[in-house]
Amino acid sequence: MTQSLHPAAQKGFSSGAELYQQVRPNYPQEIGVWLQDRLQIDENSTVIDLGSGTGKFLPYLLQTQAKIVAIEPVTEMLQQLQQAHPMVISLQAFSDQLPLDDESIDAIVCAQSFHWFANLKTLKEMHRVLAPSGHLGLVWNQRDIDVDWVKALANEIAPFEGDTPRYHTGQWKQVFEHQGLFKFNGLQNFQLYHHGTVEQVVSKRLLSTSFIAAMSQHEQQRLKAKFEQIVFDFTGLNPQDQIDFPYRTFAYHFQKIST
């Protein structure tokens, strides 16, 4: 979500915003404690939800009673957010051009988004708007590939990734290697299960992946059938049967270094 959006984000999230809102998992309840204890967010805080998407992470921020500013560059995603959370301040902007004053923000949270804008220009902009010793939280839900059928699904998807930025590659970490803007304060991880039908929480969820959502409808339907066949082969479950899709949630805590 830099000034030039990656084509997979622009096309996939524009055309797939409604599906994204419907089928993406929420987050574990422990994340609320993490926000308050680690990022020190409370009712006196002002917080940015950066790359907010359709607002899936907003309920956890709202529980802290902080003042929230949701920032999202993709119009269709922002529209879904505004429908779901009309009372939240929301802005259409890029991660490296935040329309906010210097040192005006106590914490920035990027949930399921930082890999899209992991560049030094964004880090500098975050550093600018954060108050002294302000907090940065990066959160991702990741499919638990220690489970055999989840690993098989991941293997099916992998050839289509191309150069699409992804959390699991770890490339997003490179921006933190040679910078004096943020210090790393720790990583916590949690377990999460997304319960629903195979069609809803597995195959349609996978169709909401950026580079898949950018494909033709014909190709998406072919993949949907393939995903459902993989689940059946491993579990014996049909598309309308109930299933728990296992995730691991990773929460990284950084803190601003005052220069």
Where on the chain are the PLM-derived regions?
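A short, conserved alpha-helix within the catalytic core of class I
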Residues: 117-125
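Conserved catalytic/acceptor-binding region of the Class I
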Residues: 127-196
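Conserved Class I S-adenosyl-L-methionine
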Residues: 170, 174-259
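Class I SAM-dependent methyltransferase SAM/SAH-binding core
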Residues: 48, 54-97
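Nucleotide donor/acceptor-binding cores
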Residues: 44-45, 103
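A short acidic, Gly/Pro-enriched loop at the edge of an enzyme's catalytic core
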Residues: 96-107
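Conserved class I S-adenosyl-L-methionine
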Residues: 1-42, 56
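A short beta-strand submotif of the Rossmann-like class I SAM-dependent methyltransferase core
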Residues: 110-111, 119
